[in-house]
């Protein structure tokens, strides 16, 4: 009987090295492809997510008529808030406009030789836009912070028997403001409505806020404050 001969060929080191190298190159290509897909997905999806995140902060609770329009203090955004409040006043939504004095001051005014308070600047803008000085009221000694400001507004409204308040603030501030006021006014019988100017004037537009540091402070920072408020109050 013939003996079957089996020959085993050992792979040369050169062949093994080439195989290992090819496998490593394949893995590297797959990683680069995955990274490219992730990058393209981010480029496409992130603007949509950023836009949606900005819009989630914007709420509106309308009141056809109110006892007063209340303008939340806003420092550098006082102009858009005063402008919108004046618009609502001209529409006949309320007989008076209330400003809150949070004691923050603006830049130096050479003509007056002092730093005007932001509520004073807001009052001037209201008058320029058709709100008589006699129809502008000021809530003094308001503490810093939206919730503390809401408590001050409740106290003023209660003292003056105001039961329906139409509140004006900047768009991305509306959700936290509405939550704060309703929480602060709970059990008081005060009805709260909220309105805001469209973003894009003194606040960044929803589709491009993330392109500037200021936008991250205004939009992303608002989520941080919301979480803090929900945990604290």
Enumerate the language-model features and the residues they cover.
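N-terminal type II signal-anchor transmembrane helix
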Residues: 17, 21-60
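Intrinsically disordered and other compositionally biased segments
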Residues: 7-10, 25, 64
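N-terminal intrinsically disordered, acidic low-complexity segments at the extreme N-terminus
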Residues: 2-18
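A transmembrane-helix-recognition feature enriched in membrane-embedded lipid enzymes
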Residues: 212-233
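Residue-level recognition of hydrophobic positions within alpha-helical transmembrane segments
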Residues: 28, 145, 218-221
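Coil-to-alpha-helix initiation sites in intrinsically disordered, low-complexity, charged segments
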Residues: 14, 204-208, 214, 218
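A structural signal for short, hydrophobic/glycine-enriched beta-strand patches
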Residues: 54-210
């Amino acid at each position: 009987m013939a003996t079957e001969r089996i020959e085993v060929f050992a792979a040369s080191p050169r062949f093994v090295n080439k195989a290992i190298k090819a496998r490593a190159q394949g893995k590297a290509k797959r990683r680069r492809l995955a990274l490219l897909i992730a990058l393209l997905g981010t480029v496409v999806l992130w603007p949509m997510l950023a836009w949606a995140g900005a819009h989630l902060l914007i709420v509106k609770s309308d009141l056809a008529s109110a006892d007063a329009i209340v303008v939340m203090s806003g420092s550098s955004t006082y102009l858009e808030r005063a402008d919108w409040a004046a618009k609502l006043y001209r529409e006949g939504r309320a007989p008076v406009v209330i400003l809150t004095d949070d004691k923050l001051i603006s830049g130096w005014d050479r003509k007056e030789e002092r730093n005007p308070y932001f509520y004073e600047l807001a009052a001037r803008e209201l008058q320029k836009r058709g709100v008589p000085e006699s129809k502008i009221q000021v809530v003094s000694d308001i503490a810093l912070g939206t919730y503390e400001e809401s408590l001050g507004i409740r106290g003023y409204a209660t003292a003056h028997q105001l039961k329906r308040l139409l509140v004006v603030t900047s768009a991305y501030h509306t959700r936290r403001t509405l939550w704060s006021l309703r929480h602060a006014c709970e059990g008081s019988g005060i009805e709260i409505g909220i309105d805001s100017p469209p973003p894009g004037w003194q606040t960044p537009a929803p589709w491009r806020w993330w392109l500037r540091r200021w936008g991250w402070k205004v939009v992303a920072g608002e989520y941080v404050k919301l979480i803090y408020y929900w945990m604290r109050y």
